[in-house]
Structure formats: C-alpha cells, structure tokens
Regions:
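General marker for long, soluble alpha-helical cores
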Residues: 1-291
C-alpha cells in the first residue's frame, strides 16, 4: 500500500482551513517526508498550532503512530502533550504513561509525576501523590516523605487533599524528628490551625510522652477536636478525675459549657485542698500544744 503523502503545500493552502501557525507545522511535516498516516494525524484543523507542534516533534523524535496517538487528542492542551511526549521519548512504559496521561492533571502536576518516574519511583509510591486534587506544593511534600524513606503508612497519614502543604509539612516534620505514628496521629487533623499543629509537635518533641500527652491522646482517640481534647487533657493534668472528664466528653458540650463546668470542678478541688491544708495545720498546732 502506498503510504506517500500526495498533497502539495499549494493544495493545503488552497483548502483555506488552517491558520498561518498551523500551516507552518504542516509544511515542516511535508518537508520532512512524513508518511501519509503521519500527515493525516498532523493536519487536523481542530489542533492548535502548538498542539500540532507536539505531534510533529513526536514523529521527529522517532515516536510511532501508536505512541503519538496517546497524546494527539483534543482533550490535552499543548503543554500536557509536551509532558506525555517527554515520557514517551524517555522510554516510559505504557503503565507509567497511563498514570499521568489524564486530562484532569494540569501540566505542572504531570511534570511532578513524570519527574517521579524519572527518579525511579515505583507505581505504589507514585500513586501516593498522583491525584489531581493535589497542588504541586502538596505533591512536593509527599515526594519529600518518599525521598526521606518514610513508610507508605506514614505518608498515607498526610497524603490527603484535606491537608494544605503547610499542614502536610508539620506531619512530615514529626516523622522526620523521630515521632511514632501514635505520637503524630493526634495532631494529624486538618481542622487544626498550623499554629496548633506546630505547638503540639514541638511540645512532644521537647517533652516526650509525659502525662499531658497521654491524656491528650486519650481524648483525641474519641475523635474530639484538638482544641476540645486539649482542654480536657489540661483539666486531667490538674487533677480532675477522669470519670468526670469522660462524662463531659460523652455529652458533647460546647467549649464554653465545658470551660464553665471545669472551672467549677477546679474550684471544688481548690476548696478541698484548702480544707485539707487547714485541717492538717490545725492538727499540727494541737500536737505542739500537747508538748
């Protein structure tokens, strides 16, 4: 079968279907002796001149028709096409290309996934951040966890679009500082401010597993918001009984109501302490008189 392209440049111009930029790409294809099949893929007026350029460059880089057809699709813009073409030129497998050759990824996201492939990340690692809901900055935080040797379980704790890149970094920093999964989980909470996350992380890094942290983990395990769990943990550390605090936690009181109740419980403790102190002081005074 004759696969020669028979149209002349004059024929193409006379058709009047193409812009000057598109014509320039078609003319380059003709001058480079593209086959009929290659030219038929290239000379599509629905492609912009920039998209045609990516198709042309694919053929000039030695890609086959089947390879170029992976990205010669109107669902991709020229920048997305460029990222896919780069992967093909670098001999990525079909499986690797399929991870990011999706229109829902913008060119920057495609670049980060392609860059991961070029740095020999495996499919499981790539899937940790190959999500169009992640920004480039979030992807970089996940890549850093991979680079630093965190386990998949550790990375999965923060590889979630609900965390912004700064919150992700706080969780990552905890693991890099040697904190365990159990120590990091209490502050891996997207509802916490960056300041709250940082305060918790730096506190536990400095003080370790003290009584306050144990109480905090107790109430975070009940899925209480960090601010609420913190109030109860401080109350427990001050001496209020866990039975009373557990009761308050179960009732879902507002923070204002909880603070009101805890204030009264604190006053009761203070009153009892004073009574015990006076009683002890009076007893000592009586003992001294007997002498």
């Amino acid at each position: 079968m004759d696969n020669r392209y028979e149209k002349t440049i004059e024929n193409i111009i006379d058709e009047g279907k193409f812009t000057h930029g598109q014509l320039a790409e078609i003319i380059i294809g003709i001058k480079n002796n593209f086959s009929k099949e290659q030219m038929e893929l290239l000379e599509n007026p629905e492609f912009t001149s920039g998209e045609m350029e990516q198709i042309r460059l694919g053929f000039q880089n030695g890609l086959t028709i089947n390879q170029v057809e992976i990205y010669a699709d109107r669902k991709f813009n020229q920048h997305q096409m460029w990222e896919i073409r780069e992967g093909l030129i670098n001999n990525f497998s079909e499986e690797q290309i399929s991870i990011y050759a999706k229109p829902e990824f913008d060119p920057v996201q495609m670049f980060e996934i392609r860059n991961g492939i070029q740095h020999k990340l495996n499919t499981e690692q790539l899937q940790l951040y190959a999500n169009p809901k992640f920004t480039r900055e979030q992807m970089l935080e996940i890549q850093e966890g991979i680079k630093q040797g965190l386990s998949v379980q550790q990375i999965q704790l923060y590889a979630d679009p609900k965390f912004d890149e700064h919150q992700m970094n706080e969780i990552l920093s905890g693991f890099l500082a040697g904190l365990t999964m159990e120590q990091v989980q209490p502050y891996a909470d997207a509802s916490m401010s960056l300041y709250e996350m940082n305060s918790y992380r730096t506190y536990i890094e400095k003080n370790g597993e003290n009584e306050y942290i144990q109480f905090l983990k107790r109430y975070r395990a009940l899925d209480l918001p960090m601010k609420y769990a913190n109030i109860l943990a401080q109350a427990a550390e001050s001496g209020i009984s866990l039975n009373k605090l557990d009761y308050i936690a179960e009732k879902n009181f507002s923070i204002e109501q909880t603070k009101f109740l805890l204030d009264h419980l604190q006053k009761d403790i203070a009153t009892k302490t004073n009574e015990e102190t006076h009683k002890y002081a009076g007893k000592n005074k009586g003992d001294m008189k007997d002498r």
